[in-house]
């Protein structure tokens, strides 16, 4: 069937900010879809609230709107643009829920706008628990015994009848939000109450637990002619009970018989046909390991995290195909872009193994509960490809960037065999390392299987890795064992550890013995047809399929898995660097390990190496490709950390030299630059011992800001106010040494601001100054940023501009640099310099219309800014105001304290733009899912230091008609100032307390700045958690409250008595 001619304009809805459960995979799928529709000649309008995406670049669609994904704003865009159709299935759960809401509001019918790809009835049948259950019963497909509950009592009745444990699955939520496994009555009451609160339709499915069954996923495609195929089958290493986003996953399935695969494949095809979905679907199933009995767990009627993984695992671009199918093309009409010859109706075939491991944020959040369940906690994931499972598994392990190169780098010596075996359940993020340690101790595969229900096939693969470790340690220097270990994925560093050598020595032995990797192509057809894809992975075999181009090449290092502090912003910069390299006439090569991102779409670069970002793996590619140079500035700390070892191996690092990169990170060298330029800077010292740190802090005077050197996202950064707090920090957060000093600075109270600088060593251009709303002490990644500045004096802006330009020149910056300031007593103090692309690059690029990463890459390749039409200085701003706001995922991590501080906690960002600051702020709050009430009750519970400032804010709320509530200390202070206030008791004292008020929906806003306290049961912490659980706007910084009040005041009319 040819593509539809009756539609011309299509609106694509993006997925919004990155949160746990919905990450960069939707930037990848949305970008693919928009480009795919443009390729077919359609006029594409794109709306998304996330500025850190490739998807929101001007060239991706004909019109791009960075606006809140709310009904109000989408309706405005629909009325203005009048598209013929909406494609909602590529924007994750956000896109689907928006389509449903627009339809129910009657907007689609009124404007005669059609939904493409998936009809609303199919969305409802898959997402509404009751309709899904009815459909499965009609199809005679088995689902676990269950009941749809709209009250806690209904949930409890089911469990009392069918027994515990039960699984709670809320309807229309993301990443298992609000769900869980309840083993007791009280757990069920708590989980179901929370799930009902978070479900937009107040509905949860309570089902008999089938935890322990094998979890299998199928990615399925269907077109309007009812042609359907399975793109990929994937098997979870973890049995049912761990959210698939937190599961280790292999592709293709590893432990099923052909009969089992065909049985479940048939069921998947039957379901997509029954739903009449035109596009892609993810179907999750559970298989009883003891029989041929299976259950359908869930159907996602959209492109998902798993489909991004399946696309990268097979090379089959699901989102691109789904977009073409949505406009009427059929699978037998679409060419498979990987082969360039076969049609899209051919099911991909794999002659390799893919291994995905999630990346969790527990290195950032020491207090978080590391146990895994049905609610997702991972921020990102890595994928690795190998010729056998051991190879793929070990490549994935070293891709995680958690300081390990193999399974023997993380051991649990402090635990007995019994304690370690017991710690395996419930599953934790480090279970793979626990299993290896148990096997090393001689605990049997059968014992571990009985405890975890992980298939013995997978456990045997881990056991094989442990056996190879043992063999290596008794055959030091043996090349035969070395080759066998390399074929099974062992890193040089792991082998070096077992041989008592350095990784460089092992590398030399390997090269001397000609034990070198070859590169195989990912071609979707298991080499059955000729292929033209430039997508490769390393393995230790004979035939190399990657041929070095005659054209000079440049390698760009990606940023690895998405984690807090290093998000999709760096992938954005990586993709732009590739475009600039290609336009300059070079071959652009990407190395990355993240299956969710645009950079690992093989059509972006001239060559893609899906490999770990370690020194060994990068050098192997460099040995083959012999590039002109390597770009490290866009890969976050991952790539920057490789700069020096790469240079030591003779690699040409493009842009700022390694010596100058190190000068920015080395405290004494950097201080020297600051002194030479006579720039104001907070008093700071370096310490390499605990006593040295105490002496430094006492000399500077408390409070001090303390942090390790070489970090990203403020990891292990704190403000401490006494010797006791400092000693606690030194024991808990860092291992201090000569090689790893800590930096101690005077903590200056003041507003923060920052600039990105583009420099070629002679000309330094500042695209804009970003002013933070929160004062110093809140990490810049967690602050709201405003461009252009609204409150900074001209004197301060001039000081910042001059300081940044002088720093760029003094540091010999070639490319990008980020400079952060604190404004104290109307003077700009330099607090940090990052000699690389920062997380603000996408935002400042969008609002100034300057492709900074591309310009920086051109500079690295030798172009001069003067020749591009730039001169040194600050570029003037236009009349619009833009706000970048952080997004947090605290609902997924209830054990993490939401009080903001110098350690970064946000997972994503949104942008609000308008003609005035209050309007831009309003959009930013709406895009952040912060309700902006017109009136209601506001709770104040603030630290002593904040009480005077809180009075003014409370008066402003009171003038708007809000009723004031407070905890006892804050309330007494308000009463002294004659403010009308209702005082709530301490939580332990009575039911008239803040948490109860939040649970009963009596409070509309919570302002809580009571200091962090490691006790999870402290009142401040419990109030913060209750606000998050009940979706009540929570503010932990008074500056943000003031900005929120600016919005409320701008939207309200004054009512005054006549004088």
UniProtKB/Swiss-Prot annotation:
Provide the residue span(s) of the region labelled Allosteric domain.
930-1059
Annotated binding of Mg(2+) 4, by residue: 832, 834
Entries under SMART domains matching the protein: CPSase_L_D3, MGS
Annotated EC: 6.3.4.16, 6.3.5.5
Binding-site residues for Mg(2+) 1, renumbered to this chain: 284, 298
> What cofactors does the UniProt entry give for this protein?
Mg(2+); Mn(2+)
EC top class named in words: ligase
For region Carbamoyl phosphate synthetic domain, the annotated ranges are 547-929
Q: Where is the MGS-like domain?
A: 930-1059
Keywords annotated in UniProt: Amino-acid biosynthesis, Arginine biosynthesis, ATP-binding, Ligase, Magnesium, Manganese, Metal-binding, Nucleotide-binding, Pyrimidine biosynthesis, Repeat
Which segments carry the region annotation Oligomerization domain? 402-546
What are its GO biological-process terms?
Answer: 'de novo' UMP biosynthetic process; glutamine metabolic process; L-arginine biosynthetic process
Q: Which residues bind Mn(2+) 4?
A: 832, 834
**Which residues make up the binding site for Mn(2+) 1?**
284, 298
| Catalytic reactions on record | hydrogencarbonate + L-glutamine + 2 ATP + H2O = carbamoyl phosphate + L-glutamate + 2 ADP + phosphate + 2 H(+)
Q: Where does ATP 2 bind?
A: 707, 746, 748, 752, 777-780, 820, 832
Entry GO MF terms? ATP binding; carbamoyl-phosphate synthase (ammonia) activity; carbamoyl-phosphate synthase (glutamine-hydrolyzing) activity; metal ion binding
Q: In which pathway does it act?
A: Amino-acid biosynthesis; L-arginine biosynthesis; carbamoyl phosphate from bicarbonate: step 1/1; Pyrimidine metabolism; UMP biosynthesis via de novo pathway; (S)-dihydroorotate from bicarbonate: step 1/3
What CDD domains is this protein classified in? MGS_CPS_II
Oligomeric form and interacting partners? Composed of two chains; the small (or glutamine) chain promotes the hydrolysis of glutamine to ammonia, which is used by the large (or ammonia) chain to synthesize carbamoyl phosphate. Tetramer of heterodimers (alpha,beta)4.
Q: What does this protein do?
A: Large subunit of the glutamine-dependent carbamoyl phosphate synthetase (CPSase). CPSase catalyzes the formation of carbamoyl phosphate from the ammonia moiety of glutamine, carbonate, and phosphate donated by ATP, constituting the first step of 2 biosynthetic pathways, one leading to arginine and/or urea and the other to pyrimidine nucleotides.
Regarding domains, what does the record say?
Answer: The large subunit is composed of 2 ATP-grasp domains that are involved in binding the 2 ATP molecules needed for carbamoyl phosphate synthesis. The N-terminal ATP-grasp domain (referred to as the carboxyphosphate synthetic component) catalyzes the ATP-dependent phosphorylation of hydrogencarbonate to carboxyphosphate and the subsequent nucleophilic attack by ammonia to form a carbamate intermediate.
Protein name as annotated: Carbamoyl phosphate synthase large chain
- Species annotation: Leuconostoc citreum (strain KM20)
The organism's taxonomic lineage, starting at the top: Bacteria, Bacillati, Bacillota, Bacilli, Lactobacillales
The protein's gene is named: carB
